[in-house]
A protein has these predicted regions:
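Conserved N-proximal alpha/beta basic substrate-recognition cap immediately N-terminal to
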Residues: 15-126
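Rossmann-like NAD(P)H-binding beta-loop-alpha module
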Residues: 120-147
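Glycine-rich phosphate/pyrophosphate-binding beta-alpha loops
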Residues: 273-286
Length: 311
């Protein structure tokens, strides 16, 4: 049965609405929509005759026009797969999913992000991903002996947690050490200048740059969550082109692209974040980022008929 009315409620999928949820809620209200917050853990599949198969709390009889994904909480492998299954199923039912499950999968996994950037020729640091401690140790010895430091990161992670710099003589993390979890994700350390640590966050919405900032810190990790300061930044053409190419490489509605410039001026993409925070960016940029996100999201609603459930 097709809907015969337009439901103006929009689920924001998150376990913790916080400041970002409040900003999105206000932006939706300004456009005549009502934001409702639903944790993905409260959604489930219900495969019954004459049912679309996906149940969202508060949308048992009619599926929403779209859902705005603001968070996919961590958990066991099975729990995370289940939450992504919900996003995949909603998209198959012609519900607009922003960002969709595939985009989140491509970017939450740093190895796949790096591979896609490499595949599309987007400049990114030399990277190795392996399970073998022997392989990882050999890479570390070779690179550090050549005076190239490494950075080890958790395959899944954000806000700079678990990121470490490896230099010659440093002890190597054991396979099941915290934030390693049996997989070694190694990148060449990009030297932006000792004592002048900085990188850039470029916020991309629908293949255009919405806003950007430079992050400066008293440590080589410049993440705002790690105490970095923010300044508004207007990307030069090369940086803008690289940021847009990175977003295109992972095929995503919106994202935060982290870029670093080395001592010689060369730019590298460090990461692409599919559920980026923008509180720090909003503090230094005049653009209303939540409104721009909501406007883009709304523009993608109604592309096709939505399937509705039968009570």
């Amino acid at each position: 049965m097709h809907r015969d009315y337009v439901d103006k409620r929009i689920p924001i999928l998150t376990d913790d609405p916080g400041w970002h949820g409040d900003q999105l809620s206000k932006a939706f209200a300004a456009r005549g929509f009502e934001a409702v917050f639903i944790p993905l853990r409260d959604c489930h599949l219900e495969l019954l005759p004459d049912s679309p198969g996906v149940c969202l709390k508060g949308f048992e009889s009619v599926l929403p026009q779209g859902v705005f994904v603001r968070g996919v909480a961590g958990g066991t492998l099975q729990q995370v797969i289940m939450r992504l299954d919900i996003l995949h199923a909603l998209k198959m039912l012609n519900v607009t999913v922003y960002n969709d499950g595939r985009a989140i999968e491509r970017t939450v996994d740093k190895a796949m992000t790096s591979f896609l950037l490499h595949l599309q020729g987007v400049p990114t640091p030399s990277t190795w991903v392996c399970e073998s401690r022997g392989q990882a140790e050999a890479i570390m010895r070779r690179e550090t002996m050549a005076r190239r430091d490494l950075v080890i990161k958790p395959l899944f992670g954000s806000q700079g947690v678990g990121v470490r710099r490896l230099q010659q003589g440093n002890p190597f993390p054991v396979p099941m050490a915290e934030h390693v979890d049996g997989v070694y994700y190694l990148q060449n350390y990009i030297d932006a200048g000792e004592g002048a640590w900085h990188d850039y966050r470029v916020f991309v919405i629908n293949h255009r740059i919405c806003a950007a900032m430079v992050r400066r810190g008293n440590h080589w990790i410049n993440n705002v969550a790690q105490g970095g300061s923010c300044e508004a930044w207007i990307p030069e053409p090369e940086m803008a082109s690289i940021a847009l190419a990175a977003a295109k490489a992972v095929d995503i509605d919106y994202c935060g692209v982290d870029i670093i410039r080395d001592r010689s001026g060369k730019l590298y993409v460090l990461e692409v974040n599919s559920i980026p925070a923008w509180r720090g960016l909003q503090q230094v940029c005049p653009q209303d980022i939540a409104h721009e996100l909501v406007d883009d999201f709304i523009s993608k609603l109604g592309a096709s008929d939505r399937l509705s459930a039968i009570v």
